[in-house]
Amino acid sequence: MNTPTIERAIKESHNARAAIVRGDASGYLALFSEADDVTLGNPFGPFGRGRKNVEERLALAASKYRDGRNASVGFIAQYVSESLACVAEVESAEAKVAGGAEMTKVSVRVTSVFRLEAGNWKLVHRHADPLQIPQ
């Protein structure tokens, strides 16, 4: 069996981040597990628990961003076992946020947990906190 690597799933999450700051949540929707134990915490509201709730939270987050660009990721740590992986990163981009007209630098601390499901690494938890002080 040719199992996709965790590195590929992480790259897909970086692509999803670049898309969501342009208002497009489809990358995260594809990457999140279909299982009902998924969770999402982001700066725009309380934690989402369960696939349907996570979909709603992703749509809300995407609606808060426009015209995103210059997405980048700073690696902090990665822990991988046979079926689970945890990644800590700092993600940055520029975007118009919450209806604002000006481009704003947005940096968040992110913890992502992936699970190997049917040969594919799927996102099961993502938590992003805004950085108040540049790292």
Language model features with spans:
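A solvent-exposed, acidic/Ser-Thr-rich amphipathic alpha-helical stretch
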Residues: 4-7, 25-80, 90, 104-105
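Residue-level signal for tight coil/turn positions that link beta-strands
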Residues: 82-84, 118
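Short, low-complexity N-terminal intrinsically disordered segments enriched in polar/charged residues
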Residues: 1-31, 83, 135
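Outer-membrane beta-barrel domain signature
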Residues: 99-101
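Generic short beta-strand segments
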Residues: 90-96
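Short beta-strand edge/turn micro-motifs at domain boundaries
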Residues: 107-134
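Hydrophobic alpha-helical segments of small multi-pass membrane proteins
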Residues: 76, 93, 109-113
